[in-house]
Amino acid sequence: MNEFTHFNEQGRAKMVDISEKEASVRTAAAVSSVSMNREVHEKIKNREIGKGDVLAVAQVAGIMAAKQTSAIIPMCHPIALKGVDIAFCWEKKEQKSILHIQSNVKTKGSTGVEMEALTSASVCALTVYDMCKAADKGMVIGPTFLLEKTGGKNGDYKREKADVDMED
């Protein structure tokens, strides 16, 4: 297991120095989901939620969140993102509908974008909840997880089983 790098010799928090790391293309994909009742799914699909187009607003919120990750996660470096793309797909299970969210983030820099992808997917889910809570307070967010990442000295990572096919 790698040793923790966010602590100094005194055991205090520090931001890792990445000034000597080589810039390279780095990508990350993260997934989250929101489980809701079927009526809310239909309202979202038909754009009948009073606060507006839920998926459009969630998409913009997710992009904004990726760009602001370093402002809310203490040890994240500010990163010049080169792209953020968010996709949605629906799954019907028993009496529920599940909105799956995938955020794909890309940069060319000295550190990865996993936290930006995770933050983006999470904020998309939170935005859906916020916009639909009047119609269904029983919505459930999650799971949220890193699907894959490329680039960097630690190499690529791909989750073995994703349970979600975002091609739907």
Curated annotation (Swiss-Prot):
InterPro entries: MoaC, MoaC_bact/euk, MoaC_sf, MoCo_biosynth_MoaA/MoaC, Mopterin_CF_biosynth-C_dom. It holds the Pfam family MoaC. One of its GO terms (molecular function) is cyclic pyranopterin monophosphate synthase activity. Its EC number is 4.6.1.17. Pathway: Cofactor biosynthesis; molybdopterin biosynthesis. Substrate binds at residues 75-77, 115-116. It comes from the Bacteria. The keyword Lyase applies. Catalyzes the conversion of (8S)-3',8-cyclo-7,8-dihydroguanosine 5'-triphosphate to cyclic pyranopterin monophosphate (cPMP). PANTHER family: CYCLIC PYRANOPTERIN MONOPHOSPHATE SYNTHASE, MOLYBDOPTERIN COFACTOR SYNTHESIS PROTEIN A. This is Cyclic pyranopterin monophosphate synthase. The lineage of its organism: Bacteria, Bacillati, Bacillota, Bacilli, Bacillales.
